[in-house]
A protein has these predicted regions:
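Conserved alpha/beta-hydrolase "acid-adjacent" motif
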Residues: 239-245
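Cap/lid segment of the alpha/beta-hydrolase catalytic domain
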Residues: 57-73
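Catalytic active-site module of serine/aspartate enzymes centered on a nucleophile-bearing elbow/loop
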Residues: 255-285
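Alpha/beta-hydrolase
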Residues: 137-221
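Conserved hydrolase catalytic core segment
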Residues: 89-133
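Conserved acidic catalytic loop of the alpha/beta-hydrolase fold
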Residues: 73-91
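Conserved HGGG/HGGXW glycine-rich cap/lid loop of the alpha/beta-hydrolase fold
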Residues: 10-62
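Short beta-strand/loop motif that positions the catalytic acidic residue
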Residues: 226, 232-234, 238
Length: 285
């Protein structure tokens, strides 16, 4: 694990994988996940020529909490990290609930971000019909996200279950997943990464989880304002964030390309890891 002491005194935890001198890509992990989320076979990342940097958001893993954080005030943390690593331009990748953070970085650092890749993304929740494009659990957050005491109670419950028995927690998470995801995580190496990532997410309790919910109430920008090229990958069988959500997000982004993986689920990022990473080597300046 690597850490950076930010200007305001907080700690930012990150990891680096892949090719040391490869194309830098900063990954935004999903909701209830951590910097440990990546394909466990590092050879694939090396072969793709990618220097992958994964980061714990505030309250997750080893990164200090940041009460009241938003998508936009996450950007200075990433900017400081890129400066520390002496990275001028870079790509941004995300999975699931990491997508608003990826787009926020593209919005605020448009002169430094050359490409954005979103996999199984969540779109804005404050639009008509949003609840029709996601699992009922996200519908709950959409409906009650403004009730902070209720969300804190829900977050503490999530953290307690994850910290008491991570294998059981992962089983329950996957129970309602489509068959492609269940098959994917039958691979024990992937399953261990999955469990390790979620266990790390709740290391400090529910701070990260709760912070993500509160941040999602208001993005602070619109997809129409993103001028960076965006590639979206989504599985047709995703039952957490439906493919229609990714398609609608692509329609709102000025320079987006949407690719559907037929017969794949929410975690198609791991099955198609190499292809997704290769997106960053296309049309490099």
């Amino acid at each position: 694990m690597n850490t950076l002491r930010l200007k305001d005194g907080r700690q930012l935890a990150f990891e680096q994988y892949g090719a040391e001198n490869g194309i830098p890509v900063i990954h935004q992990h999903g909701f209830g996940d951590s910097r440990l989320a990546r394909h466990p076979d590092n050879r694939l990342t090396i072969e793709a020529g990618i220097r992958l940097i994964t980061v714990d958001r505030p309250g997750y893993g080893e990164s200090s909490p940041y009460p009241g954080r938003t998508f936009l005030n996450w950007v200075p943390d990433i900017e400081q990290l890129a400066n520390q690593l002496k990275i001028d331009k870079f790509g941004v990748m995300s999975h699931s609930g990491g997508s608003p953070y990826a787009l926020a970085i593209a919005y605020k650092l448009k002169n430094r971000v050359n490409k954005v890749v979103l996999v199984s993304p969540i779109g804005p929740l404050n639009v008509p019909g949003a609840s029709e494009t996601m699992h009922k659990s996200f519908g709950f957050l959409l409906k009650f996200g403004w009730l902070k005491p209720l969300i804190r109670i829900a977050g503490k419950s999530e953290a307690k279950r994850a910290n008491s028995d991570i294998a059981k927690y992962a089983d329950n998470w996957l129970k309602e997943s489509p068959e492609p995801d269940k098959i994917l995580f039958a691979n024990q190496t992937l399953r261990k990464m999955f469990e390790d990532g979620m266990k790390e997410a709740f290391k400090q309790g529910a701070a990260g989880w709760v912070g993500d919910v509160f941040a999602g109430i208001n993005w602070g920008f619109t997809p129409e304002e993103i001028q960076i090229p965006v590639k979206i990958f989504h599985g047709s069988e995703d039952e957490l964030l439906f493919a229609e959500m990714g398609r609608r997000l692509a329609q709102r982004l000025p320079h987006a390309d949407f690719q559907l993986y037929e017969g794949e689920g929410h975690y198609c990022i791991f099955k198609h890891w190499s292809e997704i990473l290769n997106t960053f080597s296309q049309d490099q300046e």
